[in-house]
Amino acid sequence: MKQILDFIPLIIFFALYKMYDIYTATGALIVATAVQLILTYVLYKKVEKMQLITFIMVTVFGGMTIFLHDDNFIKWKVTIVYAVFAAGLIIAQILGRPIIKGMLGKEVTLPDNKWNKINYAWILFFTACSIANLYVAFEMPLDVWVNFKVFGLLGLTFIYTLLTGMYVYKHMPKEKKEEQE
């Protein structure tokens, strides 16, 4: 259910972009992200930091897009969000508190060196997505960027999450694997 909530603003953004324009879609994205945040809190009594960061970025850059009537701001939002996620993972790694381990470490037991590899892999992933978005956003037509944002980045994230899950499963202690099966 929580994952479905995460995709609703993106679906609304895409649909309204196709029906109207980037400005209508951006306004709807701001509203849908706010509603998503409220629903997440009501249903789960907790909001993840990533959701809060995304909401703030959507509101700031989406607001600038609408107010200044310049779609470059919403394009920058995607790049900056991915860069902030990568920077957060880097800082946490330097401080010796890998975020991925904090998110999954209660359910999954892995050696620290495996958690570090996963953390570094996600740093690379978020950095690559940030750079890829820069290229597509500013070198391709708006339609291509919207499709890339909705389907390309979403698809890449889904695949990367699956690959991470496979890596985790491969390195889980044998008794934990048996419990999961």
Swiss-Prot record:
Membrane topology field: Multi-pass membrane protein
Q: Where in the cell is it found?
A: Cell inner membrane
Q: Which UniProt keywords apply?
A: Cell inner membrane, Cell membrane, Membrane, Transmembrane, Transmembrane helix
This protein is called Inner membrane-spanning protein YciB
Native organism is Aliivibrio salmonicida (strain LFI1238) (Vibrio salmonicida (strain LFI1238))
* Biological function: Plays a role in cell envelope biogenesis, maintenance of cell envelope integrity and membrane homeostasis.
Q: Which Pfam families match?
A: IspA
Q: Which NCBIfam families match?
A: ispZ (TIGR00997), PRK00259.1-2 (NF001324), PRK00259.1-3 (NF001325)
Gene for this protein?
yciB
Regions that span the bilayer? 22-42, 50-70, 80-100, 118-138, 148-168
Q: List, alphabetically, the GO terms of the cellular component aspect.
A: plasma membrane
Q: To which protein family does this belong? A: Belongs to the YciB family.
